[in-house]
């Protein structure tokens, strides 16, 4: 079981050394969103393979430690998932990954990247139905 300090160190590691923080071009999905209360801005990117799985994911943006760390962590989790898998991801999972007691007062920051990605995945699926 991870301690509160373990969760904090993981968040700080993802903030200080973000994974996949870059604009992904070409991409199949690009969507942005923000959290005016905290000044967070996140742009999520994804490229799909021929089977409809996420082959690469990245993000750009700026904001608080939690929103940026959550986006970094999410990009690692997205690779290999289908858009349907993304639709099934829950905000509770994100909060658990970040440490529930660490981010309990900052859930909008913690779930911003997933909110953007879920919305973009739904839009892509609607627009590309055969």
Language-model region placement:
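Short beta-strand elements
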Residues: 40-50
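Short solvent-exposed loop/turn micro-motifs enriched in small/polar/acidic residues
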Residues: 26, 39-40
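Immediate flanking context of iron-sulfur cluster ligation sites
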Residues: 52-61
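Short, thiol/selenol-centered motifs that function as redox-active sites or metal-ligating centers
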Residues: 38, 61-69
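Catalytic-loop motifs flanking and including active-site residues across diverse enzymes
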Residues: 66-71, 109-112
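Alpha-helical support elements that line or immediately flank enzyme active sites
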Residues: 70-81
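C-terminal binding/interaction regions
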Residues: 1-25, 30-31, 55, 81-130
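Short Gly/Pro-enriched turn/cap motifs at secondary-structure boundaries
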Residues: 33-37
């Amino acid at each position: 079981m991870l301690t509160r300090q373990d969760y904090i160190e993981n968040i700080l590691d993802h903030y200080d050394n973000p994974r996949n923080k870059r604009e992904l071009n070409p991409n199949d999905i690009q969507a942005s969103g923000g959290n005016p209360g905290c000044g967070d801005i996140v742009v999520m990117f994804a490229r799909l393979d021929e089977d409809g799985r996420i082959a690469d994911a990245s993000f750009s943006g700026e904001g608080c430690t939690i929103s940026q760390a959550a986006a970094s962590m999410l990009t690692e989790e997205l690779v290999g998932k289908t858009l349907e898998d993304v639709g099934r991801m829950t905000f509770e999972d994100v909060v658990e990954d970040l440490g529930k007691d660490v981010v309990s007062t900052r859930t909008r920051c913690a779930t911003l990247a997933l909110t953007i990605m879920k919305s973009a995945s739904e839009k892509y699926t609607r627009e590309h139905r055969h």
